[in-house]
């Protein structure tokens, strides 16, 4: 039997992460929530408070996502390093336990940034690379399988390998995700679902997400892990 690992990760620290966490708990699926405590893209009322992050950490892994969510390659090295280190220190003080996982805002990273994350004491860093069924060879550029979002740019890669009826189905990200998961069951590998709770809400995709979670949950010979447990 080939090894199959399922992991999920959710970015930004939005208050809707609590709704997402409840769904994951219902289906007994592991998850890592990447928190940017002062995320500049949202008002304070839209972000999880420290107390709510602590509550989330009792069931799920908490990872760092910088303090304010800048695109790190666009800022000076000193600012990038401070964002990375401060986010780790903030969360470790808040949670009173090690924070080993990091996620680059927008997935944007460079070799220099990977080195900064490593030097800050993280064990791994997740990107937003999609379409992979493995954990990658670089712990500081970990890829994903599918984003819980409709990326039309993902569709052309399937044009030559699927007939028109299949193409109609995979236009839905959740249907594509189920097909990729089923392939993973056959071939082995890592199925890594990621997304944003606020994005799922904006797109009214809670039903789709729940159907996908029900499909991948409680499978024999499947190991459910946090991102930090991948490395």
What are the functions of these language-model segments?
Residues 1-58, 90-93, 98, 175, ...:
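Active-site beta->alpha N-cap acidic-glycine motif
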């Amino acid at each position: 039997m080939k090894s199959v690992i399922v992991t999920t990760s959710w970015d930004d620290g939005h208050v809707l992460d609590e709704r997402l966490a409840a769904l994951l708990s219902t289906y007994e699926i592991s998850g890592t929530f990447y928190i940017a405590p002062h995320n500049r893209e949202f008002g304070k009322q839209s972000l999880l408070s420290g107390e709510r992050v602590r509550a989330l950490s009792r069931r799920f892994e908490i990872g760092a996502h910088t303090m304010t969510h800048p695109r790190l390659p666009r800022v000076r090295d000193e600012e990038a390093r401070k964002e990375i280190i401060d986010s780790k220190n903030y969360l470790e003080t808040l949670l009173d336990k090690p924070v080993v996982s990091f996620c680059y805002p927008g997935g944007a990273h460079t070799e220099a940034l990977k080195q900064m994350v490593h030097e800050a004491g993280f064990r791994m860093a997740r990107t937003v690379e999609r379409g992979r069924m493995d954990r990658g060879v670089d712990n500081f550029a970990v890829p994903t399988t599918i984003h819980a979002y409709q990326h039309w740019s993902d569709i052309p890669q399937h044009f030559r390998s699927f007939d028109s009826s299949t193409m109609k189905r995979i236009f839905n990200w959740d249907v594509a995700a189920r097909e990729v998961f089923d392939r993973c069951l056959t071939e082995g590998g890592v199925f890594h679902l990621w997304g944003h709770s606020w994005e799922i809400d904006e797109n009214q995709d809670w039903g789709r997400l729940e159907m996908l979670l029900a499909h991948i949950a409680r499978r024999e010979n499947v190991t459910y892990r946090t991102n930090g447990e991948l490395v």
